[in-house]
Design a protein with these regions (language model features):
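Short C-terminal tail/terminal secondary-structure segment
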Residues: 57, 68-83
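Conserved SDR Rossmann-fold cofactor-binding beta-strand/turn motif
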Residues: 12-22, 60-63, 73-75
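Active-site loop of short-chain dehydrogenase/reductase
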Residues: 8-11, 70
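Alpha-helical segment proximal to the catalytic Tyr-Lys
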Residues: 4-5, 65
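A conserved structural motif in NAD(P)-dependent oxidoreductases
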Residues: 41-52, 63
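A glycine/serine/threonine-rich, flexible loop-to-helix segment
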Residues: 8, 18-40, 51, 81-83
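Conserved active-site helix of classical SDR/Rossmann-fold NAD(P)-dependent CH-OH oxidoreductases
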Residues: 4, 11, 53-54
Length: 83
C-alpha cells in the first residue's frame, strides 16, 4: 500500500527480512542452540552483520532504483528450508 501511495512521488518502499544474524543480541546459551539456529538456514550458518548491512545498502542505493513494494529476504534460505 505505501509503495503504491508514494510511488508516484518517486518514493520507494521496501522491506528487509534478515535471518539469524551473529550479533550481541543473538546470544546462544549453548553450542547446541547455535547449531540448531544455523541448521534452520539453507546455508547452515547465521549471517554476519555486514552481510545484512550490504542488503540494506542495496535497497538504499541507486542500484535498486526500480525496486519498490517488495521484500528482500536476506535470510540464508531460512524461509525456504524444509529441514
Amino acid at each position: 500500500v505505501l509503495a503504491a501511495e508514494h510511488g508516484p512521488r518517486g518514493v520507494r518502499v521496501n522491506a528487509l527480512l534478515p535471518g539469524g544474524t551473529d550479533t550481541p543480541a543473538a546470544t546462544f546459551k549453548t553450542p547446541e542452540s547455535r547449531t540448531f539456529v544455523e541448521n534452520l538456514h539453507a546455508l547452515k550458518r547465521v549471517a554476519q552483520p555486514e552481510e545484512i548491512a550490504r542488503s540494506a545498502l542495496y535497497l538504499a542505493s541507486d542500484a535498486s532504483s526500480f525496486t519498490t513494494g517488495t521484500a528482500l529476504f536476506a535470510d540464508g534460505g531460512v524461509s525456504i528450508n524444509r529441514t
